[in-house]
Each structure stands twice: as structure tokens, then as C-alpha cells.
Amino acid sequence: MKNFKIKIIILVSLLFLTACSSVKTVSKYEKKENVTWKEVEPPVILLNLEPGDIIVKEKTLNPIGMFGHAAIMKNNSIIVDYPKLGNKSYTIDVDYWLEKGRDILVLRYKDMNDEFKKRLVKNMEKYFGKNYKISSNKMNTDGFYCSQYIWYIYYITAQEMGFELDLDSDGGNFVLPYDFINSPYLEIVN
């Protein structure tokens, strides 16, 4: 009976994860056309990365990467990442995080200033170290998945400064890495 319950839970989880990939949502923002992904070849040397830059990895065919992946720059060389189920967040040098054969986009908040950047980094530290957790409530801070963490620290930083900021371009229950690409508040800088 116990094995049967485990199999059912796994089956439902797989159905949920694969079903989400084909959900059609209507973007609340204009779609960006002619997006050019930056090819990653070792050695990786990315210049001009800044705190708050969002790096989106392209989607892959495997179940872990089918939604893409995103992480955020804490400073000019260190990334904060929420990698996958069973892991907590961690920091890593961007050169070690990027992988050959998986192209990236670097997105930057258009209205970044020193005060916002300072508060954003402070919030990265405040919400760092939690377990990876998938939730349909973007405001849930018990744990995070990669793109929810990025969305939330931008959201809460803007709230602290007295304005609204929603980087999720389709406004769904989940914020996925590709949702950042069409946000009017972000620009592609690679």
C-alpha cells in the first residue's frame, strides 16, 4: 500500500510538471521579438555584469530544464541560485555556473539606481538559504524556486521603496524564467 501511494504521488507530480509546460497564458505585456541568446563557450568571461542582473538559461529537453532556469547576480561575479528540489540556495562564481551548450540571456532592470541596488542585495541576503520549494503562491517565503526568488526580491524591494513592480510578464500563479524576458521593466543586455 505504501509503495502504491508513492507511485501515485510521483505520477501526479510528473503530470503536474509536464502539464504546466503547455499551459497557454496571455501575456499582459508586449512580446519582445528577435531575442538573441548569448552562446556560452568556455572559458566564460562575461563583462559588465551588475548586481541585480538576471541570467536566464535556455530551456532543455530534460524534465529539470524544460522551463529554463534563472539566477541573479549578487555582485559582479557571484550568482545567487535556487537549483532544484532537495537543495537550498547557494552562491557560486558565474564562470562555474554557466555551462557549455546552454545559451543565456542577461536581463537588467531598466530603472536600477544605487538605492534600489543596495536594498535589492540586502533582500537577497535576507531571503537566502531557504529550501527549494515550488508553490503557486508567489508571496510564499517559506521556500523558493529559482524564478520565484528573483521575482520576490524585486517585488519586495520595490514595496519597501513605495512602488509596485511585477516582473512576471504573464501574471500567472507561477513565475517562470521565460516570464522575465517579456517584462517591460527589464532589458536584454547581452
Where are these regions (language model features)?
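C-terminal motif of bacterial Sec signal peptides marking the signal peptidase cleavage site
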Residues: 17-19
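Mixed-charge, Lys/Arg-rich low-complexity intrinsically disordered regions
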Residues: 29-47
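Extracytoplasmic/secreted envelope proteins and their assembly/folding machinery
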Residues: 46-53, 68, 76, 117-121, ...
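Glycine-rich catalytic cores of cysteine/serine-nucleophile enzymes that process amide/ester linkages
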Residues: 49-109, 132-141
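Sec/Tat-exported extracytoplasmic proteins
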Residues: 53, 59, 83, 124-132, ...
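A structural motif
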Residues: 103, 110-129
